[in-house]
Amino acid sequence: MNEQYYSTGRRKTASARVFIKIGKGKIKINYIDIKKYFNQKTYITLIKKPLEIINMTDKLDIFITVKGGGISGQAGAIRHGIARALIKYDSSLKTTLRDSGFITRDSRCVERKKVGFKKARRRPQFSKR
């Protein structure tokens, strides 16, 4: 019973490929341990949140390859990918993960810069005279 479950997660411009199999709770991101890849504890807790809700932190090994975006976007993409892979592992988890908001893809991304503006919404300074 060495089955592997695969899913993708996306956030901003980052995309993560997540592979889950039954193990001892190891998490590797791009062949690097999670604590070395994300040195801030907030990102590690964000990633482990779906596993904590279903009490599977020490039962699954997770291997992740992530590309694009920054640290925050990559952490969000990994969390999204883990949640989707857990549903493939056990479909009965879908309701609990959906209620927690892990399945829904966060569609917020950077607003584009408009012509004539300094930034996305910042207009040039107005001069009366």
UniProtKB/Swiss-Prot annotation:
GO terms for molecular function: RNA binding; structural constituent of ribosome. InterPro entries: Ribosomal_Su5_D2-typ_SF, Ribosomal_uS9, Ribosomal_uS9_bac/plastid, Ribosomal_uS9_CS, Ribsml_uS5_D2-typ_fold_subgr. PROSITE patterns: RIBOSOMAL_S9 (PS00360). Disulfide bonds: none annotated. GO terms for biological process: translation. Pfam families: Ribosomal_S9. Keywords: Ribonucleoprotein, Ribosomal protein. GO terms for cellular component: cytosolic small ribosomal subunit. It comes from the Bacteria. PANTHER family: RIBOSOMAL PROTEIN S9, SMALL RIBOSOMAL SUBUNIT PROTEIN US9M. Belongs to the universal ribosomal protein uS9 family. This is Small ribosomal subunit protein uS9. The gene is rpsI.
